[in-house]
Regions:
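Conserved P-loop NTPase mechanochemical-coupling segment
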Residues: 1
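Class I S-adenosyl-L-methionine
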Residues: 18-29, 33, 37-58, 68, ...
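Short, flexible loop segments at the rims of nucleotide/cofactor-binding pockets, characterized by
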Residues: 6, 57-62
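Conserved SAM-binding strand-loop segment of SAM-dependent methyltransferases
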Residues: 4-14, 212-215
Length: 231
């Protein structure tokens, strides 16, 4: 079995076979939608700051994953949150009402105003407003990158300490960074593209270093305060 708390450069179909049934408490995934995102124009409106960042065209979004992917995802995880669920309706279990909506906070552009996520939870539909400009703060490395804040929101809804989280298409690594920030969660990510995986691992390592430094500074501050009280 593969180690936890790592992002692997491998095909998720092979990776999921490494784990027993129901190993992960929650899968939060963002598979290809099959809409040819690399073929969409970079210019999205008259305001240059809203334009897409130029990314290497890799032609990974030509088709949605096969049915076998969704069955394997359901096998290895107890619950699922699947971004782009509206593209995969024939493959998903029907009857669940707990859809999520990411309102991008920028309306009237050539891209969609929002994105939908299917969930396996019977909960009310929830909406999260997070402007795409937030990606500028994260640092954009992937054409369909989602903000870390969006994943943090999803985790706040469905994840609890001690859970194991899976992301089969980690892309920029935003979901894994959100897991690390929340604390108390184990995670596994897969990314088949070597370039994206390398960049995502760099982002994750930077986040881990930042939090370690913050924790160290906090410890030093507590020690200094304790010394003041004992003098």
């Amino acid at each position: 079995m593969l180690e936890l708390n790592k992002l692997y450069n491998m095909d998720c179909m092979q990776g999921m076979k490494e784990f027993p049934d129901g190993f992960f408490d929650l899968a939060i995934v963002d598979p290809p939608y099959g809409i040819g995102i690399d073929g969409q124009k970079k210019r999205v409106c008259g305001n240059p700051k809203h334009n897409r960042k130029e990314h290497i065209r890799k032609s990974w979004d030509k088709a949605i994953p096969p049915l076998e992917y969704f069955r394997e995802l359901e096998r290895v995880s107890k619950a699922q949150v699947i971004w782009g669920g509206n593209y995969f309706v024939p493959y998903l279990e029907q009857g669940h009402k707990g859809w999520l909506v990411w309102d991008k906070g920028q309306h009237g552009l050539t891209m969609s105003d929002c994105e939908l996520a299917y969930t396996s939870f019977d909960t009310p539909t929830r909406v999260f407003v997070c402007n795409r400009v937030e990606l500028l703060n994260d640092g954009t490395i992937h054409p369909t990158q989602k903000p870390v804040k969006l994943y943090s929101w999803v985790l706040s809804l469905f994840a609890r300490k001690g859970m194991k989280i899976l992301d089969t298409h980690a892309g920029s690594g935003s979901s894994l960074i959100a897991c690390y920030r929340q604390g108390g969660l184990d995670f596994v990510g897969f990314e088949i593209d070597e370039d994206y995986c390398r960049a995502a691992n760099e982002r994750l390592e930077q986040e881990q270093a930042r939090i370690r430094l913050f924790d160290l500074l906090e410890q030093e501050e507590r020690k200094a305060q304790a010394t003041l009280f004992t003098e």
